[in-house]
Every structure is written in C-alpha cells, then in structure tokens.
Amino acid sequence: MKRVLAIILGGGAGTRLYPLTKLRAKPAVPLAGKYRLIDIPVSNCINSEITKIYVLTQFNSASLNRHLSRTYNFTGFNDEFVEVLAAQQTAENPSWFQGTADAVRQYLWLMEEWDVDEYLILSGDHLYRMDYREYIQRHRETKADITLSVVPIDEKRASSFGLMKIDDNARVVDFSEKPKGEALRQMQVDTSILGLSPDQARKNPYIASMGIYIFNREVLGKLLRQNPEQTDFGKEIIPGAKTDYNLQAYLYKGYWEDIGTIEAFYESNLALTQQPQPPFSFYDEKAPIYTRPRYLPPTKVLNCTITESMISEGCILKDCRIHHSVLGIRSRVESDCTIEDSMLMGADYYESSTKRKAVLEAGKVPQGIGAGTTIRRAIIDKNARIGRNVLIINKDRIEEAEREDEGFLIRSGIVVVIKNATIPDGTVI
C-alpha cells in the first residue's frame, strides 16, 4: 500500500451539521464521546497500511489541525504523514475551493510529487470500518481507471446519493448525482446482480455511491486538467468519465452511514448503545479506531442508575439517572438529573472546585449539567453550562427552531445546545 496516497475531503461549511460546525470543521465534530469524525477514515487508512494521508479543509480548521497534529504524529525517517491542507489563494487559483474536485485540483501539484500509482479519495463525515486493501486489490485486478465503492440503498434515501447502473462485469454504465422524481425512478436496478437475496433486492433497488473513489494517478490528473470548469466529483467528473474510462463498482457489505445531518449524526451516535450488538462497534482489536490519547482519570459514578449508555473517561456523575445516552469526556452531571436519549459531548477542560464555588456565589452557571435538570432527545455540545432545574425536553414538539441568541437550535425535533452556551437555571426548552 506504499503506492497509494489517501486524500480525505473535509467538506464544505457543514451547514447541515450546524451548529456543531459553528466553531469547528465538519471532520472535527466529536463522535461517540471521545473520537472525532476524522478519526474514522484516518484509522481505516492506518489499519489498511496506507500512511500517506492528506486532509483537505476550508472552514474552521484550527481544532482539526490541532487534533491531527497531536494524534497522528508519525515520527522517524519515513514517508508516513497525516497532514492538513487548508484552502489557500494563489496567483493561479485566486478563489477558494469550489467543490470536491476543485479542492483536489488546487493541490494536485503537491500530490503529484509523490511516487504513487493510485489516489484513494475519502469523505470526512462517514461512519464505517473498511479494509481499503481489498478495495484497491479489486481496482487493480479489474484494470479499472476509476473504482467507486457502492452500497445498495432503499428508495427513501436514494435521492440523497449519487446512483448508478452497472453491467454484469460491475462496470458503471450510467451515473446520476442525487436524482429526483422520474430521473430517480430511471436509476432503479435489480440489485441481485450484487449478490443480494431477492428480498433484499426488492427493499434496496438502487446502487449508491459512498463518495469513496480510487483513481489511477494519470487518470485523475488528466480529468482535472482537461475539465477545469468541473468542480465536483459526483456531479461532473464521474458522470463525464463513464464513457471514455473503465469505471468499476466495488460492493461494500459492512455498516456504513453518512452522518452529514444533525438527525443522522444523532441517530448514529445513539445506535452505538444498541444491545446486544450495535451496528458499528469501536470494540475491534484487529481494526481499532485511533484518537488522541488524553490521559484522563477513570469516570466517577456516585449512586447513579445507568442503562444502555456509553460513558467516556474523566466524567463525574452524581445521583443521576442516565438512559440510552452517550456522554463525552469530562462530562459532569449533578444530583437528581435525568438524561435520556441524548448525546453530551463533554468538555475540553475541568472547572476546579474553587472556580465552581466562585461561579455559583456570583450567581452564574458552572460547567456541566446542574442539579435537578432533565434532558431528553438532545445534543449538548462541549463546555455547555446547563443550570439547575432546567428542562430540555422540546416541550412544544417543535421540529425546527432558530434560537441561537438563547444558546440552542432545534433540528428535526432534536434540541442542540451550542458549544460554550449557557442555559440559565429554571429554563424550559
């Protein structure tokens, strides 16, 4: 795998994940209590023996930069690296990244300095575990110019993805990016060609691109230079290449979830608590997911009732009830609290006992979840200060709300408390 260079696309402004992307790049959004989204593709690369990795970003990349430099520091005299490439303006390219393909085009000069055969292009906001060695092996065996990783998908979600038709040799013969209406129905295929059972094929009559591509080095360079007006892989580069190049589809059979929206992000995190076996597990010794070592103390649990939940290290929990929830590092929950169906991202630092006492005496709200508070179906971003006897339960069953000046938003019925926000004592949301 030394002949492969990985390129992870950090995505755009992350508007669908706002406000989680208000102060951070999309790949830096916390996941499962202690990880970040970027840890998934980087870990998959490392476990697949791919250690030349670029991450392309444009928005709020400071925390992502910090996380990657502290986590994936390959030392020694070798060619292993994980490096962030932020959008920049040059004499040749006076504008920012205009799309996924344009982002790669603007740094193609740097990527071509590496003596590799293939470029593996990945997305920074997917949850899955994949051995890219098998994927690359299939690409080489079929003598493909481009190979797309694909999954069968149902009609409900199909219009959110690039869809394709393939022949008996898994060659892509038609491709349409996020089709709607009649164009969507025309992309229906018999997915039993992928080896699905008749019942599975009926439920999933579409073949969707995962947004994961392998390009031969010369092919990518040629496509990007010959089509400077084309800025997106899914909308322009891939559909335009299907006639002149050998495009192959590679079926991925494991769990895969695009977590680019608040609802998908929320559901994917809480699914990790599923019993007896969650759809995705971080407990895999053969293919671990890596993240920054923080050297935090064990979580302190004082007379709590905790069911179907994941509690990260360094938390302090007192006389509370936690059900079907994920608690991030350094989470603090005071007595008589109830946390249900929620994700608490925790904190970046501890507030000392002396500081907490001074904050309370000043009539302000200390970090963490105050006594007597109830939180249901919510995402609480890092360093939030939730007062005493607060109800975050979406009392009026509102689907969408913009209350950023009050420290929260509602997306798909999920209350999202913004990073560093303060919710005063007695507030009812």
From Swiss-Prot:
What NCBIfam families does this protein's entry cite? glgC (TIGR02091), PRK02862.1 (NF002772)
Which pathway does the database say it acts in?
Glycan biosynthesis; glycogen biosynthesis
UniProt-listed Enzyme Commission number(s): 2.7.7.27
Superkingdom as given in the UniProt entry: Bacteria
Q: Does the keyword Transferase apply?
A: yes
Q: Which InterPro entries match?
A: ADP-Glc_PPase, ADP_Glu_pyroP_CS, GlgC_bac, NTP_transferase_dom, Nucleotide-diphossugar_trans, Trimer_LpxA-like_sf
Q: What is the purpose of this protein? A: Involved in the biosynthesis of ADP-glucose, a building block required for the elongation reactions to produce glycogen. Catalyzes the reaction between ATP and alpha-D-glucose 1-phosphate (G1P) to produce pyrophosphate and ADP-Glc.
List the Gene Ontology MF annotations in alphabetical order: ATP binding; glucose-1-phosphate adenylyltransferase activity; structural constituent of carboxysome shell
Residues engaged in binding alpha-D-glucose 1-phosphate: G162, E177, K178, S209
Q: Is Nucleotidyltransferase one of the keywords UniProt gives this record?
A: yes
Give GO terms for biological process.
glycogen biosynthetic process
Its family remark reads: Belongs to the bacterial/plant glucose-1-phosphate adenylyltransferase family.
User: Which interval of the chain is the signal sequence?
Assistant: none
Can you cite an annotated GO cellular component? carboxysome
Under which name does UniProt file this protein? Glucose-1-phosphate adenylyltransferase
- Per the record, what are the reactions this protein catalyses? alpha-D-glucose 1-phosphate + ATP + H(+) = ADP-alpha-D-glucose + diphosphate
Keywords tagged on the record: ATP-binding, Carbohydrate metabolism, Glycogen biosynthesis, Glycogen metabolism, Nucleotide-binding, Nucleotidyltransferase, Transferase
Summarize subunit and interaction data from the UniProt record for this chain.
Homotetramer.
